[in-house]
Regions:
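The feature captures the beta-strand-to-loop junction immediately N-terminal to the Walker
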Residues: 36-38
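Helix-to-loop junction immediately C-terminal to a conserved catalytic motif
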Residues: 51
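Conserved ABC ATPase signature
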Residues: 121-125, 129
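Conserved beta-strand-loop-alpha-helix hinge in the C-terminal portion
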Residues: 205-230
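Conserved ABC ATPase "signature" region
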Residues: 99-117
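H-loop/switch region of ABC-family ATPase nucleotide-binding domains
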Residues: 185-186
Length: 237
């Protein structure tokens, strides 16, 4: 199986703070990987590292150069423009003519159930609509790898279900090729539904790397999660 990312003893420090320490692992094409751990465990830093927004300060990271990536944040940035223009901009920057980019943007918005808001200002949309718009913005670029940093954390239950359904749909890929999806989440139910593999981080260290079924085995979970961690209504806090 082709490795999209290979980390060897990778570390990231911000001054005296070790955000990641001695991280060694491979992520293969087509995997659906959940990053779990309490706040400050290194999940966001790892996503930024994989996306090229952060360089390792120790060790080595190898990434497949040809892979097209998209990253979604918990609170996506919206331009002061229409929803259609927000989606079209990435295509235009990739060399697509503006007219074609706008047509493809509308197809992307329809894909996430937002065709009716194409001409509305993106900043007037609800949080759930903005996150779906961000998914459309990524989808039209046909990424092979999608990185998501707690994309449903700030959404209401209905919007969470909508975005999660789209994540599952997108993770299935297109043209018979599954997309590689790596996402950070505190929601263990979401992890169980969407992931095939779980990386458990704490204080920048990888404590467990398990198939999702093994992670949720009661004995394994108890052995993996230190007693100081609390699980409240399916959320790891």
């Amino acid at each position: 199986m082709s490795a999209l990312f290979e980390l060897s003893a990778v570390g990231v420090r911000f001054g005296a703070v070790a955000a990641l320490s001695d991280l060694s692992l491979r992520i293969n094409a087509g995997e659906r990987v959940a990053l779990v751990g309490s706040n400050g465990s290194g999940k966001s830093t790892m996503l930024r590292l994989l996306h090229g927004l952060q360089r390792p300060t120790a060790g080595r990271l190898r990434a497949q150069a040809a892979s097209r990536q998209a990253m979604l944040f918990q609170r996506p940035f919206m331009l002061r423009a229409s929803a259609r223009a927000n989606v079209a901009l990435g295509l235009w920057l990739a060399g697509v003519s503006w007219g074609l980019a706008c047509r493809q943007a509308m197809q992307g918005l329809a894909r996430v159930g937002l065709a009716e808001v194409g001409e509305r200002s993106a900043r007037t949309l609800s949080g759930g609509q903005q996150q779906r718009l961000a998914l459309a913005r990524a989808w039209v670029l046909a990424p092979e790898v999608m990185l998501l940093d707690e994309p449903t954390a700030s959404l209401d239950p209905h919007a969470k279900r909508e975005v999660e359904a789209l994540m599952a749909d997108f993770g299935a890929g297109r043209d018979g090729r599954p997309m590689t999806m790596i996402f950070a989440s505190h929601n263990l139910g979401q992890v169980k539904r969407l992931a095939s593999r779980v990386l458990y981080l704490e204080r920048g260290r990888l404590l467990a790397d398990l198939p999702v079924q093994d992670f949720f085995n009661a004995q394994r979970l108890q052995a993996t999660a230190p007693a100081a961690h609390l699980f409240v209504k399916g959320e790891l806090v």
